[in-house]
């Protein structure tokens, strides 16, 4: 099964919390803090694997979560770092942010790696907070939570030449005659149901990669037929070979077919429509009147398409000439990276300290309760001792530095209101 798009959820690992611990040894009466740091969370790393040609694996697995770092321990023991999660994808995979559809990365090189989400940083243990004036801190730093993202993986096969045309015009036959690819070939429409790639290695020319996609029909840009959903696989090509059935055995006009395909191409992508084209009149072995080809060639060249060839993929007549012309043109067209405009590029927002604040109005008592919730709050409270004055000062410092007090003031908090974080509640004093 050929799968070329997939939507998945990815999350990097949380950092482990720093430990609150003190030395307690029989002959060490003044032992001091010895809480170790938490380990960092594992990252989400995408890796290009040349042996993979489809996104089929992502049809069955939709969630990828890296390992979290372990919490720190006593005796200055550091928590173990979480294992990073490596996700293997085919070459030519584009990663998009699911909500905006903006591009995060283009993985188009052999062995390429991308650290998509870095793991959360481990929190510092209380030993790191000891000073000359605070020799026994009863607080530690919470680990930072990992990032999470819904993404869309989109595979665009990497080929130099794309074969274009209506169904049953001979694209698959040409691919099978010039490469070692074995596409399904039969005398009916839509025999090709997935893209096929092959390397053209004709004597005397530099080898190049050629892609055959399901045939395009009129109305494809509006979603009719099969070909439009695979056009993305020839978006990266440098050259198009546009094949028409010159024999007319199916009752179609080859020039009208040529016009219709180019109209659909232009609707889909102007950039793709502007790509150089070699026009091939295939099935010449079935042509009963040579004048039909000459008339077709004249009309096409009047439109500005100079390279027009007569060919029979079935008998191999004219095939070498087409392939050599393709190789010659490719020499003058540089390989381009995927062009991504600033508007198309996804820029992540800082989401590590996420929280929500809601208000409960207590009219009878004359004060409001501001409830602060979120993963950040949970982790912060787990790393402080609310019964210790120094620990509380550190706690309030974190709330201030992260903008929580500023947001409370913007929401209208007043002197005497209560602020609740999980089970811990304190009175707000201006």
Curated annotation (Swiss-Prot):
Mg(2+) binds at residues 172, 192. Its cofactor is Mg(2+). GO terms for biological process: ribosome biogenesis. Residues 1-158 form the Obg domain. Transmembrane segments: none annotated. It is an enzyme of class 3 (hydrolase). It comes from the Bacteria. GTP binds at residues 165-172, 190-194, 212-215, 282-285, 312-314. Gene3D superfamilies: GTP-binding protein OBG, C-terminal domain, GTP1/OBG domain, P-loop containing nucleotide triphosphate hydrolases. Its EC number is 3.6.5.-. It is found in: Cytoplasm. One of its GO terms (cellular component) is cytoplasm. The keyword Metal-binding applies. Residues 159-331 form the OBG-type G domain. GO terms for molecular function: GTP binding; GTPase activity; magnesium ion binding. Residues 345-430 form the OCT domain. SUPFAM superfamilies: Obg GTP-binding protein C-terminal domain, Obg GTP-binding protein N-terminal domain, P-loop containing nucleoside triphosphate hydrolases. InterPro entries: G_OBG, GTP-bd, GTP-bd_Obg/CgtA, GTP-bd_prot_GTP1/OBG_C_sf, GTP1-OBG_CS, GTP1_OBG_dom, GTP1_OBG_dom_sf, OBG_GTPase. Keywords: Cytoplasm, GTP-binding, Hydrolase, Magnesium, Metal-binding, Nucleotide-binding. It holds the Pfam family MMR_HSR1. An essential GTPase which binds GTP, GDP and possibly (p)ppGpp with moderate affinity, with high nucleotide exchange rates and a fairly low GTP hydrolysis rate. Plays a role in control of the cell cycle, stress response, ribosome biogenesis and in those bacteria that undergo differentiation, in morphogenesis control. Belongs to the TRAFAC class OBG-HflX-like GTPase superfamily. OBG GTPase family. Monomer. This is GTPase Obg. It comes from Clostridium beijerinckii (strain ATCC 51743 / NCIMB 8052).
